[in-house]
């Protein structure tokens, strides 16, 4: 009940394609970073989770509410601007949340530096399947470690695991 009855944000984020989502107000910008969004914008602030959900359900009839993690990791950034996308969606916002529009929209760019880009995700490591993961780490995006060979590992899926880590510095 405490989580539901607090301010929530309805947002658009670009994680390779623009999507709609909701989060508790105090989770920004953490939520966008976790998703690997390269741009995001809060568009509605509701007093509770229910009203944010009403808006999200209405908008997901016109725009996805899912992140395609493979697209996000290959940095296949489309050139859609979240502000322009929102302008096209405003007429689809339900009447009961129209007074929740955020007056000053702020398009937030987020940068995830990589040593190099990967063209394709070739493998997703799982410590449950193989407890040994080796590779050269070239980047971190969202919840993922990205390795030179195109393999990735979702760190959030491994919460609670105890690991050992050997780090070698490569000379270039």
Q: Language-model features: where?
A:
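Non-catalytic accessory segments flanking enzymatic or RNA/DNA-binding domains
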Residues: 1-172
